[in-house]
């Protein structure tokens, strides 16, 4: 009888911990979105027409639906937020993540290119050994016609940030990868 009660209490604690973690992550995400939408720390934003959105979905935003009729993007130093009528997507850029490349060619149809890198240090409790794993994620963000200056401003802002903080850049690049002396990762 006591075993059943202990198992039930343990199961309840696991469910509560999982629910608390989910609530925390959701609240953190909602705060990041609210900060971006307030516009206080915005680097750039633009809207996609229905036709531009269809192209963006076909090329890069596979998580969205073409039938949404348009979409919006908001870019801040800490996140990129993309939304449409049916879905949204938040790309967090804070914490241990470092943008190591940002560029825009400035021609029609050229995307804004952003590379994000981060590292994860895993510790083995038994042997006290550490292993470091390096990760990178590339984002190609379609730029609507007429938003060239905004995309150039975003690319310039992140490139300058990377060049001014080379220590963060070199910290997230593995020893077996080439490092640019200009603080700009090739894409």
PLM segments and residue spans:
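Low-complexity, intrinsically disordered/propeptide-like segments
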Residues: 9, 13-19, 96, 169, ...
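Amphipathic repeat-derived elements
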Residues: 4-7, 76-77, 160-166
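N-terminal, helix-rich and Lys/Arg-enriched segments in bacterial and organellar proteins
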Residues: 44, 76-82, 148-150
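Intrinsic-disorder/low-complexity loop/linker signature
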Residues: 40, 51, 78, 86, ...
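Phosphoinositide-binding peripheral membrane targeting modules
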Residues: 63-120
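Anionic N-terminal interaction surfaces
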Residues: 2-75
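Acidic, Ser/Thr- and proline-rich intrinsically disordered linker/docking segments
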Residues: 97-187
